Amino acid sequence: MTRVSLSPLAWLDEVETQRRAAGLRRTVRTRPPVGAELDLASNDYLGLSQHPRVIDGGVSALRTWGAGSTGSRLVTGNTELHEAFEDVLAAFVGAESALVFSSGYTANLGAVVALSGPGSLLVSDANTHASLVDACRLSRARVVVTPHNDTAAVEQALATRSEARAVVVTDSVFSADGDLAPLRALHTACRKHGALLIVDEAHGLGVRGDGGRGLLDEVGLAGAPDLVMTTTLSKALGSQGGVVLGPAAVRAHLIDTARPFIFDTGLAPAAVGAAFAALQVLIDEPWRAQRVLDHAATLASICDVTEVPSSAVVSVILGEPEVAFAAAAACLDRGVRVGCFRPPTVPAGTSRLRLTARASLSEDEMTLARRVLTEVLSPR
């Protein structure tokens, strides 16, 4: 007979003890005011979260439309600002249409679930973001997870399927390692087998492609009729929110069926206004995208990472969680905040420092980064 605990939450103490012993306990830390420490951990790739035009864009929207959207976009949460931003962003990346969600996470949930469902096949890369993993789980489709960037495995899954409809999902730039998906090969496989390709450009927008238009633009797939792009407004555009971009028929279908769009409060006007202003800055200053890659290459060199980064992300693999955590703490003690990725975010034995480059890093900040990272990581 199973012993029933009288305390329904008693098991939490046990699993917390296990996480602590494994070096996997997480804490929520407050972020100091801007300038108090050097930030090499955030996803503010273009340095726009503090840009005066971006802040003004958020404040102007706040004063015009109020603090919140006040409801679902299908009720009271839609404004002219939302729709104008969608039009400009779609034109920028070469898509026919766009639909703003409250976050990149909900954009992925909405797109994947609404475009798959029972009786369809979902093929997902093993390293896709957690939001895509959760979307696959919620879809009620049959899910096949393929080895990382293994196009042959994707094609095999598509070729042997019994389902009429199939969807392949991938990041364009993978968040932990910063490596790129083989988008041309994936699209070729999808087109051959009549599958839809959904690409999350969260880490590609603003960094890859012509003037930051994303990796899809770079490989010549922008606006493809059998492809859907998702992205976030919380990284290169320095705000928050998410977007699904693609054919107009997809937008119409999501408005009718995507539960995170229908039942969630619309993205706050201030966030839309800030993202809109950030997009205008990127359009006016396309050099920012290359600056990110240049700084990432410098950070990789400082950390003895031999492979030239393909994105803003530089991963310094240290092995065990305790080692990575101690190195991150040592950097912070010296005034530099870096990311620390441990399982389950990354596989066991690959805990790492995750550095992110920003277009706005100054020469003095890069000098500080060099000094601190050299002190902490040498010898390894």
Swiss-Prot record:
Q: Where does pyridoxal 5'-phosphate bind?
A: G104, Y105, S175, D200, E201, A202, H203, T232, L233, S234, K235
Purpose = Catalyzes the decarboxylative condensation of pimeloyl-[acyl-carrier protein] and L-alanine to produce 8-amino-7-oxononanoate (AON), [acyl-carrier protein], and carbon dioxide.
**A GO term, aspect molecular function:** pyridoxal phosphate binding
| Keyword presence, Nucleotide-binding | no
Q: How does it assemble?
A: Homodimer.
Taxonomic placement: Bacteria, Bacillati, Actinomycetota, Actinomycetes, Mycobacteriales
Q: Which InterPro entries match?
A: Aminotrans_II_pyridoxalP_BS, Aminotransferase_I/II_large, AON_synthase_class-II, PyrdxlP-dep_Trfase, PyrdxlP-dep_Trfase_major, PyrdxlP-dep_Trfase_small
EC identifiers of the protein: 2.3.1.47
Native species: Mycolicibacterium vanbaalenii (strain DSM 7251 / JCM 13017 / BCRC 16820 / KCTC 9966 / NRRL B-24157 / PYR-1)
Which sites bind substrate? R26, H129, T345
Q: Which enzyme type, at the first EC level? A: transferase
Q: According to its UniProt record, which reaction does this protein catalyse?
A: 6-carboxyhexanoyl-[ACP] + L-alanine + H(+) = (8S)-8-amino-7-oxononanoate + holo-[ACP] + CO2
Where N6-(pyridoxal phosphate)lysine occurs along the chain? K235
State the UniProt keywords alphabetically. Acyltransferase, Biotin biosynthesis, Pyridoxal phosphate, Transferase
- The family this protein is said to belong to: Belongs to the class-II pyridoxal-phosphate-dependent aminotransferase family. BioF subfamily.
The identity of this protein, by name, is: 8-amino-7-oxononanoate synthase
Cofactor(s) recorded for this entry are:
pyridoxal 5'-phosphate
